[in-house]
């Protein structure tokens, strides 16, 4: 009988991989971020792929028990709540008051257009699902992810060249639309699982739009205002120390996540608007540096999550011809989604968005709408909500759409996320190369102009330049 302490445990292997990767990234973060221009999402996904069940086979989250889908949903929930709160407190004070029109246009028309267009692509390319199933798939990838555009809105070299109004617009949009994707997601869920359809429409308006979203926003604002009021007096009477002050960006979103889940409201919107009201007068952000504990928390969560994502990518299903998922359909769907989901509508609404001044900025904003954590969250939440345990037996057995969606929704969504990581993760390299080529061209043009001027000064005809 061997020494029990030396038995290898799967969870401990996962801790070694996660801890080792984060340590490695921290030691060489300057190289990765500012020289190689590679962010947490790309490196984390690669690490998860290497050590996951399809390569080294050291980490397989779905072998830890029978609740893999639920575990993934809760991991995503915590990461999203912390991230959207961090986005909210990063914005200038009273940002929504001064930029309300830009935010509303970027949330409602842009998200609605992307949802419907993506649903059309899914319906055309995946014949085994009906249009409601296509709307559900589109609802999962309606929101944008701030991590994949961290080099633009964070501390990357391109962030300094991005106008502050564009940077703030992207932060506000990516932080808010994670929660705003909930009505689009539940629209299909309600129509699929609630019969008759008029009851589904009633539940969607009353329970999802008004209670989950509207009341979630209101409750988040109340919590944010109260906590800001308490913080103000805690500082005034010196009741709070520095360590506790830096713990708030983690504690408050966890509080919102727990309360929101228990009372059944949209905890993502609740966390975001709690952050907005918490920092409405810059009370919090003016006393905390950009590269302090909140940034550290966000980085750690991002590294852990995308490493986890790399281990759950269903590579075996990316050429699943039996289920009508040949890889060419996934590639075409991903390309169409990334190209047409935002760019056309952002160009269309550009005159209505005061923060977007030029067509070049419209192209920039339209392109940087990456798909990430929220898509994983909603894909696995859809699997839970469409399981036999959550749907009336008569409704579940009346159609095969539930079992079909349960089988194909994650392969489709994960392939789109992977495509987004590749495209948006390396877009920065294209921009840098383009900038260098443009600079080289302009320098050569200036040099040639100076040379022509010198020839004119010494009286040499330009046609005789070769003989000088």
UniProtKB/Swiss-Prot annotation:
Key words, A-Z: Antiport, Cell membrane, Glycoprotein, Ion transport, Membrane, Phosphoprotein, Sodium, Sodium transport, Transmembrane, Transmembrane helix, Transport
UniProt GO cellular component terms: nuclear outer membrane-endoplasmic reticulum membrane network; perinuclear endoplasmic reticulum membrane; plasma membrane; plasma membrane of cell tip; prospore membrane
Primary localization: membrane
Entry keyword annotation includes Cytoplasm: no
Membrane topology summary: Multi-pass membrane protein
Pfam families the UniProt entry points to: Na_H_Exchanger
Listed transmembrane segments: 12-32, 36-56, 81-96, 103-123, 133-153, 169-189, 204-224, 258-278, 293-313, 320-340, 362-382, 408-428
Function: Sodium export from cell, takes up external protons in exchange for internal sodium ions. Involved in regulation of pH.
Similarity section: Belongs to the fungal Na(+)/H(+) exchanger family.
Record-given protein name: Na(+)/H(+) antiporter
